[in-house]
Amino acid sequence: MRKIKVAPFMPTEVEVNEISANRAEIVAYPFESGYAVTLAHPLRRLILGSSIGYAPISVKIEGAAHEFDNIRGMHEDVAVFIINLKNIRFKIKDGSDRVELKYSFSGYKEVTAQDLNNDQIEVVNGDLPLATLNEDAELNFTMVIAKGIGYVPSEDLRDEVAPDSIALDAFFTPVRKANYKIEPVLVEDNPNFEKITFDIETDAQIGPVEAFTNALEVMNKQLSVFNGVLDVDISTTLPKRTNDDNELKPFLAAVDALGLSARSFNSLDRAGIKFLGELVLMSENEIKNIKNLGKKSLDETNECLVEHGFGPEFELKENTRANLVKKLEQLKA
């Protein structure tokens, strides 16, 4: 049965699962029905569109008048060289908005992205090929790397680069992928709540969690325009997560998510037991005396406790017990 509400439910849980250095899943729940997509869609767009990255915006190649030219002794023509250059991902070490770099290579050499590393910039995908030179080749070029967001076509950059340089399409965004999925999640016995799972992958210029955090900051700053005029109250009473909250999390698993048989679950549900922690707080005799919990269901319940690390040898610390009792009272109020 639904209760009358005077405010939407505040989500309380956030989980960060780092799959690799460049990929992470960020999970948040529980949201009121419809709220998850309302928040997830604009956040995804901000992750993709507002994440700051670095890209080459121009290159000047000695001996090349335009991008369709050739350089003596270089296997690739200038157009292919430029494509290879645009695929390389950089970081400016001191965080500057722009840096100009000069390079010179000669003689037989397989030039790769890692050959561009120096005191000013770091290449994050150093194994990419750049150019193949023969024994009489000489490759001298100057490029400009800039900080930016999104994508800027070369036509829009021509006024910003030197007249004798070739303007490049600039792919600044460091985010390769930003997806989300929304799933139902049970809160007590109410299935009408939602969980958002963001799947974010970057190119290593920044990490996925940093990209997500930056998007949240941009969203907050964009919305703050209303606060000065409309006196919007953006404060929240949601408490910060404490060590106690983290310590109690294993105890707060819902009974209906423990994989018990229908008979065992129904017996516990009729007894008003909603959380694993309630069973942990009970003695062996108290569990045995749960109404309609037969021997088979009792054995299954005890096995479940053991599987979750709460077997007969488990001892609950007094302060943890007190915190758990208080938390369960709040959840079941």
From Swiss-Prot:
It holds the Pfam family RNA_pol_A_bac. Its EC number is 2.7.7.6. The keyword Cell division does not apply. Residues 247-333 are annotated as: Alpha C-terminal domain (alpha-CTD). Residues 1-227 are annotated as: Alpha N-terminal domain (alpha-NTD). It comes from the Bacteria. SUPFAM superfamilies: C-terminal domain of RNA polymerase alpha subunit, Insert subdomain of RNA polymerase alpha subunit, RBP11-like subunits of RNA polymerase. GO terms for molecular function: DNA binding; DNA-directed RNA polymerase activity; protein dimerization activity. Keywords: DNA-directed RNA polymerase, Nucleotidyltransferase, Transcription, Transferase. GO terms for cellular component: cytoplasm; DNA-directed RNA polymerase complex. One of its GO terms (biological process) is DNA-templated transcription. The keyword rRNA-binding does not apply. It catalyses: RNA(n) + a ribonucleoside 5'-triphosphate = RNA(n+1) + diphosphate. DNA-dependent RNA polymerase catalyzes the transcription of DNA into RNA using the four ribonucleoside triphosphates as substrates. Homodimer. The RNAP catalytic core consists of 2 alpha, 1 beta, 1 beta' and 1 omega subunit. When a sigma factor is associated with the core the holoenzyme is formed, which can initiate transcription. The N-terminal domain is essential for RNAP assembly and basal transcription, whereas the C-terminal domain is involved in interaction with transcriptional regulators and with upstream promoter elements. HAMAP family: RNApol_bact_RpoA. Belongs to the RNA polymerase alpha chain family. This is DNA-directed RNA polymerase subunit alpha.
